[in-house]
Amino acid sequence: MYVYTGEGGGKTTAALGLALRSVGHGHKVVIVQFMKGRKDIGEWKIARRLAPQYEIHQFGREGFVDLKNPSEEDKQLAKKGLEFAREVAFRKPNLLILDELNLAVAVGLLKLEEVMKLLDEIPKEVVVVVTGRYAPKELIDRADFANEVKDVKHPFKKGIPAKEGIQF
């Protein structure tokens, strides 16, 4: 299992790099995005061109989740995402990316115990990638590879907005 966590930008981007590399080798990739519902992002738009080796599924609203007080809808969507991840894992994709799963746990959309149970059930031949800030120690301990992303410099801090095709 791979974990990309930390306060910096680029965690999803790193996971998508693995996805692209995997698809390039003819492998099957499934991405499950928690807390995301935008269809104008590059990883969503490319899905039709890379199918059937690449699938992406979103379990979030189009707007932002209130991290201090997530809605009941946000919690239900996250639970649906976790159930979907369980189902899709048994199709045995080569790579299963659980994007923003760490943050979904940190803000209380999902319980860590539920996530650990899912990870126990995933067939061993499926490579799992988990992204998001605030990865719990239990997930990092379980990982074969864990990376903490830290911004040294970021255009957003200068007031430069996110660029299509780069940050989304």
Pin down the residues of each PLM region.
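Residue-level preference for the first positions of well-ordered beta-strands
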Residues: M1-V3, K28, N94-L95, V127
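Conserved P-loop
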Residues: Y2-E87
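Short, glycine/charged-enriched secondary-structure capping and boundary segments
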Residues: G17-L18, W44-A47, S71, L110-E114, ...
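Hydrophobic/aromatic ligand-binding patch that stacks against planar heteroaromatic rings
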Residues: R21, I46, L118, E138-L139
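Conserved nucleotide-binding/hydrolysis micro-motifs of P-loop NTPases
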Residues: M35-R38, E62-F64, N102-L103, Y134-K137, ...
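Phosphate-binding/switch loop-helix module in NTP-utilizing enzymes
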Residues: D66-V127
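Conserved D-loop beta-strand region of ABC ATPase nucleotide-binding domains
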Residues: T131
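Phosphate-binding/switch region of NTP-binding enzymes
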Residues: A135-F168
